[in-house]
């Protein structure tokens, strides 16, 4: 009995110390810890295909494929990495969310120097690329044997915000994208770094609400 109590008492301060050490990463004087969240909602010109969801996370970017659409996000001059990719589909729309995790829960940590942070605020570009996974040229044949070309690949200029650059393939009717870059230690430090936000939408020039449903990892 006494041995059990002794073991419990020994474990309690150790547990507290572990949590403190984890979040003490935010006390660094020469590093900042920034997080990123990218949300993409793409509506296609036809119902989604039944495909296997696939995702990939690489340095400074990630991608996800589902429903016949590949959504790729590259972070240029942002010094940030994604840790999770989630996706949700509904009839003719693909919803995707790319996020990072807190520095005390996941490696590699999104740490940067003050100079990197300044460059991020001035030069960070979130390059979003929507690519159709079906070659529509195979589906349209003129009676004289000449193939009909699909609509020209359309490049959407980054004239709405200062962070997002978006390229959308021919099968996408509408697209909405959000970007949030925030101080991961903002709730711990006395003075947090202001959050950077940007959005792009092709629907009436107004941002849609972010889908609240649960995103599945794939």
UniProtKB/Swiss-Prot annotation:
Its main location: secreted. GO terms for cellular component: extracellular region. The keyword Glycoprotein applies. It is found in: Secreted. It holds the Pfam family Orthopox_35kD. Induction: Expressed in the early phase of the viral replicative cycle. Glycans are attached at residue 70. Keywords: Early protein, Glycoprotein, Host-virus interaction, Inhibition of host chemokines by virus, Secreted, Signal, Viral immunoevasion. Residues 1-16 form the signal peptide. The keyword Signal applies. May interact with several cellular chemokines to interfere with chemokine-glycosaminoglycan (GAG) interactions at the cell surface to alter chemotaxis of nearby responsive cells. Belongs to the orthopoxvirus OPG170 family. This is Protein OPG170. The lineage of its organism: Viruses, Varidnaviria, Bamfordvirae, Nucleocytoviricota, Pokkesviricetes.
């Amino acid at each position: 009995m006494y041995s059990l109590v002794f073991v419990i008492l020994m474990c309690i301060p150790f547990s507290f110390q572990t949590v403190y050490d984890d979040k003490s990463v935010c006390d660094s004087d020469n590093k900042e810890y920034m997080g990123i969240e990218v949300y993409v909602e793409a509506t296609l010109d036809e119902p989604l295909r039944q495909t296997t969801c696939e995702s990939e996370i690489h340095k400074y970017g990630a991608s996800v494929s589902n429903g016949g659409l590949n959504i790729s996000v590259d972070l240029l001059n942002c010094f940030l990495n994604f840790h999770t990719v989630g996706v949700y589909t509904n009839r003719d729309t693909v919803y995707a969310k790319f996020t990072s995790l807190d520095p005390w829960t996941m490696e590699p940590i999104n740490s940067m120097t003050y100079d990197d942070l300044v460059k991020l605020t001035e030069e960070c570009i979130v390059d979003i690329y929507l690519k159709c996974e079906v070659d529509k040229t195979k589906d349209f044949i003129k009676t004289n044997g000449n193939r009909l070309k699909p609509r020209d690949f359309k490049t959407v200029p980054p004239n709405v915000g200062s962070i997002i650059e978006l390229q959308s393939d021919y099968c996408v009717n509408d697209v909405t994208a959000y970007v949030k870059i925030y101080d991961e230690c903002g709730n711990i430090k006395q003075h947090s770094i202001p959050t950077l936000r940007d959005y792009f939408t092709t629907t009436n020039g107004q941002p849609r609400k972010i889908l609240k449903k649960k995103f599945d990892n794939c």
